[in-house]
UniProtKB/Swiss-Prot annotation:
Expressed by the skin glands. Keywords: Amidation, Amphibian defense peptide, Antibiotic, Antimicrobial, Cleavage on pair of basic residues, Fungicide, Hemagglutinin, Secreted. Belongs to the frog skin active peptide (FSAP) family. Cruzioseptin subfamily. One of its GO terms (biological process) is defense response to fungus. It is found in: Secreted. It comes from Cruziohyla calcarifer. This is Cruzioseptin-3. GO terms for cellular component: extracellular region. Has antimicrobial activity against Gram-negative bacterium E.coli (MIC=13.32 uM), against Gram-positive bacterium S.aureus (MIC=13.32 uM) and against fungus C.albicans (MIC=13.32 uM). At higher concentrations also has a bactericidal and fungicidal effect. Has hemagglutinating activity against horse erythrocytes. Its main location: secreted. Residues 27-28 form a propeptide. The modification Glutamine amide is found at Q25.
Protein backbone atom coordinates (compact mmCIF):
# COMPACT_ATOMS: atom_id res chain seq x y z
CA UNK A 1 0.00 0.00 0.00
CA UNK A 2 2.99 2.29 0.49
CA UNK A 3 3.68 1.89 -3.23
CA UNK A 4 0.12 3.03 -3.97
CA UNK A 5 0.67 6.18 -1.89
CA UNK A 6 3.91 6.86 -3.78
CA UNK A 7 1.99 6.62 -7.06
CA UNK A 8 -0.70 9.01 -5.79
CA UNK A 9 1.95 11.51 -4.65
CA UNK A 10 3.75 11.25 -8.00
CA UNK A 11 0.51 11.82 -9.95
CA UNK A 12 -0.40 14.73 -7.67
CA UNK A 13 2.97 16.42 -8.24
CA UNK A 14 2.72 15.87 -12.00
CA UNK A 15 -0.83 17.24 -12.09
CA UNK A 16 0.14 20.26 -9.98
CA UNK A 17 3.09 20.97 -12.27
CA UNK A 18 0.89 20.70 -15.37
CA UNK A 19 -1.74 23.04 -13.92
CA UNK A 20 0.92 25.55 -12.87
CA UNK A 21 2.43 25.40 -16.36
CA UNK A 22 -0.94 26.04 -18.00
CA UNK A 23 -1.68 28.96 -15.66
CA UNK A 24 1.72 30.51 -16.35
CA UNK A 25 1.18 30.22 -20.12
CA UNK A 26 -2.32 31.67 -19.82
CA UNK A 27 -1.01 34.76 -18.04
CA UNK A 28 1.60 35.47 -20.72
Amino acid sequence: KRGFLDVVKHIGKAALGAVTHLINQGEQ
